[in-house]
């Protein structure tokens, strides 16, 4: 069971990083750090409008 949990955790991390890289190229600013992007994604789900250091705005 431990190996299954480990695989699931890795999948979640990879999915999160992929979604962050998508946001950084599509809607968010290039100077948005990864930690800030993670907070924005958690806060806004898939509706991040602005992501800058210390600033996170959701669209819609």
UniProtKB/Swiss-Prot annotation:
Cleavable signal peptide: 1-28
Broad class of the protein's primary localization: secreted
Subcellular localization: Secreted
Tissue: Expressed by the venom gland.
Listed GO CC annotations: extracellular region
Record keywords, A-Z: Disulfide bond, Ion channel impairing toxin, Neurotoxin, Potassium channel impairing toxin, Secreted, Signal, Toxin, Voltage-gated potassium channel impairing toxin
Top-level taxon in the UniProt lineage: Eukaryota
Disulfide bonds, paired cysteine numbers: 32-51, 40-56, 44-58
Annotated GO MF terms: potassium channel regulator activity; toxin activity
Record remark: domains: Has the structural arrangement of an alpha-helix connected to antiparallel beta-sheets by disulfide bonds (CS-alpha/beta).
Function: Weakly inhibits the Kv1.3/KCNA3 channel (1 uM of thetoxin inhibits currents by 13.2%) and Kv7.1/KCNQ1 channel (10 uM of the toxin inhibits currents by 27.7%).
Family: Belongs to the short scorpion toxin superfamily. Potassium channel inhibitor family. Alpha-KTx 29 subfamily.
Name of the protein in its database record: Potassium channel toxin alpha-KTx 29.2
The organism of origin for this protein: Lychas mucronatus (Chinese swimming scorpion)
């Amino acid at each position: 069971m431990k190996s299954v949990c480990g695989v699931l955790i890795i999948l979640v991390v990879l999915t999160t990083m992929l979604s962050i890289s998508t946001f950084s190229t599509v809607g968010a600013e290039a100077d948005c750090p990864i930690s800030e992007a993670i907070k924005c994604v958690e806060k806004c789900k898939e509706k991040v409008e602005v992501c800058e250091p210390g600033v996170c705005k959701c669209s819609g």
